[in-house]
Swiss-Prot record:
Gene Ontology BP annotations: cell morphogenesis; protein autoprocessing
Enzyme class, spelled out: hydrolase
GO molecular function: cysteine-type peptidase activity
Disruption of the gene: reported phenotype: Deletion of this gene causes hypersensitivity to tellurite, altered population dynamics during long term batch culture, and, most strikingly, dramatic alteration of normal cell morphology.
Underlying gene: stiP
Induction record: Highly induced by starvation during long-term stationary phase, while shows very low expression during exponential growth.
Protein name: Cysteine protease StiP
Function: Cysteine protease that may play a role in regulating cell morphology in response to stressful conditions which likely cause oxidative damage. Appears to catalyze its own cleavage, which probably leads to its activation.
Pfam families membership: PELOTA_1 (PF15608), StiP (PF11202)
Post-translational modification: Is probably processed via an autocatalytic removal of a proregion of about 100 amino acids.
Activity regulation annotation text: Is inhibited by bromopyruvate in vitro. Activity is not affected by the presence of tellurite.
EC number(s) reported in the record: 3.4.22.-
Length: 383
């Protein structure tokens, strides 16, 4: 039974939800807007690794992308926009077969949001009703149960589809399982996590397991509705603690108004939509269990081998995949970048960032397959 009734949930969403720089029908963020003082990147790294603070309690200032960064993003778009449009269409076609309407897309902030908006449009264009929310899930702390229960109170649980951009090591999938694996509403079938690229081999549905340059993976808020990653300064509410009185206590985020002139969230969606609408008929996305398992085995072997080779006790210091490796350079204190190929077009931005940050690079060939890039975070404390 829902914690609040449908009318109360609708009222709460309309009152407290927002859409950032997206159109209101494209996504509703179930996050509370906040302001906290930014933490210097090096100090944040020290606090994380010392255990003094969890990463979700702090955030560093997000700077405007440089002209070179935007130039490399445009190259990524030229390379990948056709593939992205095709894979969005393939995923949407599978979703309309698998779920009854309306499909309730629940994207994980931030990486899932651009894909969620694209899927929203593709599902609508297939003639099916769809709604889209952006909520928080935090490694080690779980999904935002208050936000999720608000959605369930309004729409039920049967047609919920969780959306993320890709899987790196599979940490968010593990967090989803830990949060909802014993929830009777979701028992009996795999948790429906949809991603573009399931490199870690742990998603319910993916367009591929390739580590490729997903354009939305190499920008931050300026392609995700001008919001920060989610923030949770205090203790998180567990599933059992949600009541009608605290169901509005969603995780938080910052709106980055200072980056408004650089925001391309809408242009990105429009551009991919225009390509998608001109596509030839596409086959439905299929992510076979055998394919998924092979991917999972290979990716786990790489992570475990690197942990041994570089004496890494905390595997959160290993950031595999082009997208994760790039984000780690921008947001963390990198120690080393491992590349599969020295001249890979898809790692051009990553290589540019290593030059700026003076991060060492090693080309290691197929040792890191299926990944094409991995960033190792600098060790500042234990492990």
């Amino acid at each position: 039974m829902a914690i609040i009734n449908k009318d109360k949930a609708t009222e709460l969403i309309l009152k407290q939800g927002f859409s950032g720089s997206y159109q209101s029908e494209q996504v509703t963020f179930l996050l509370k807007r906040t302001h906290i003082e930014p933490t210097d990147t090096a100090e944040k790294e020290r606090l994380i690794q010392s255990g003094e603070k969890h990463y979700s309690q702090m955030i560093s200032l997000e700077n405007a992308p440089t002209a070179r960064h935007l130039e490399l993003f445009e190259q990524a778009m030229q390379q990948g926009q056709q593939r992205l449009a095709q894979e969005v269409q393939q995923l949407a076609q599978t979703l309309v077969v698998e779920f009854n309407e309306p499909i309730v897309l629940v994207s994980f902030v931030r990486a899932g949001v651009p894909l969620g908006v694209l899927l929203y449009h593709a599902i609508q264009d297939l003639g099916r009703d769809c709604v889209h929310y952006g909520i928080s899930i935090i490694r080690d702390r779980g999904i935002d149960f208050a936000a999720l229960e608000t959605i369930i109170a309004r729409h039920g649980h049967a047609s919920i589809v969780f959306v993320d951009g890709w899987t790196g090591k599979g940490a968010i999938r593990q967090e989803l399982q830990r949060s909802l694996g014993n929830d009777t509403r979701f028992i009996g079938k795999p948790l429906p996590l949809v991603v573009l690229s399931d490199i870690a081999g742990c998603a319910w549905l993916a367009a591929s397991g390739d580590d490729w340059l997903i354009p939305s993976g190499i920008l931050g808020s300026t392609i995700s509705g001008l919001i920060s990653r989610s923030i949770c300064e205090g203790e998180t509410l567990s599933a059992d603690e949600i009541t009608a009185e605290n169901i509005d206590q969603w995780h938080r985020c910052i709106e980055y108004h200072h980056l408004k002139e650089f925001d391309i969230s809408q242009q990105f969606i429009q551009r991919i939509n225009q390509i998608r609408l001109k596509l030839n008929p596409q086959s439905n996305a299929v992510w076979a269990e055998t394919q998924q398992q092979a991917q999972q085995d290979q990716s786990q072997q790489v992570v475990h081998k690197l942990a041994q080779e570089y004496d890494i006790q905390n595997i959160n210091r290993i950031k595999p995949s082009i997208a994760e490796a790039t984000r780690a350079i921008l947001r963390r204190v990198p120690d080393l970048v491992l590349l599969r190929d020295a001249d890979d077009e898809d790692t051009r931005l990553l290589r540019h960032l290593t030059q700026i940050t003076k991060t060492p690079v090693q080309v290691v060939g197929d040792q890191i397959a299926p990944y094409r890039a991995i960033t190792l975070i600098q060790k500042l404390g234990k492990g």
